[in-house]
Amino acid sequence: MMRQSVQTVLPESTGNNTLSLRDSVCRDLFQLFSSPHSPLPILLVSGMPEWQGHNQSDKLLQSWYCRQLRSALLFHEPRIAALQVNLKEAYCHELAISLEMMLYHDDEPLTFDLVWQKGSWHRTMPQ
């Protein structure tokens, strides 16, 4: 299996540079989830057919999903220093996740929320 690598130049953490780093990470994460050719495992990107066949309230399944997603995202996004993946909602046709992360060269946490609805991922605003 061939792995893709991403080379990233990290900006200094001053003013607009930090904001553009945060925007860039969010944009790249959304693109990673939205791309039909994403290097993320298929269940993590468009896995609702597989998700529907399981008990969505199964805590072991939810924990496995979060661990797999965390591992894949840390591998594909080198600007993330720390990451926590939380399942906010898990229903048959809808899945809501929250990514809470710390970026290198940024002192503030960043939250990125996604919802799987009607066959695709959508960004939501954190509450």
UniProtKB/Swiss-Prot annotation:
InterPro entries: Anti-adapt_IraD, IraD/Gp25-like
Zinc in keyword set: no
Keyword list, A-Z: Cytoplasm, Stress response
A single BP term in Gene Ontology: cellular response to oxidative stress
Superkingdom, natural source: Bacteria
Cellular component annotations (GO), alphabetically ordered: cytoplasm
Subcellular location: Cytoplasm
Main location: cytoplasm
GO molecular function, a single term: anti-sigma factor antagonist activity
Keyword Methyltransferase: no
Known partners and oligomeric status: Interacts with RssB.
Functional description taken from the UniProt entry: Inhibits RpoS proteolysis by regulating RssB activity, thereby increasing the stability of the sigma stress factor RpoS during oxidative stress. Its effect on RpoS stability is due to its interaction with RssB, which probably blocks the interaction of RssB with RpoS, and the consequent delivery of the RssB-RpoS complex to the ClpXP protein degradation pathway.
Family statement: Belongs to the GpW/Gp25 family. IraD subfamily.
Record-given protein name: Anti-adapter protein IraD
Chain's gene name: iraD
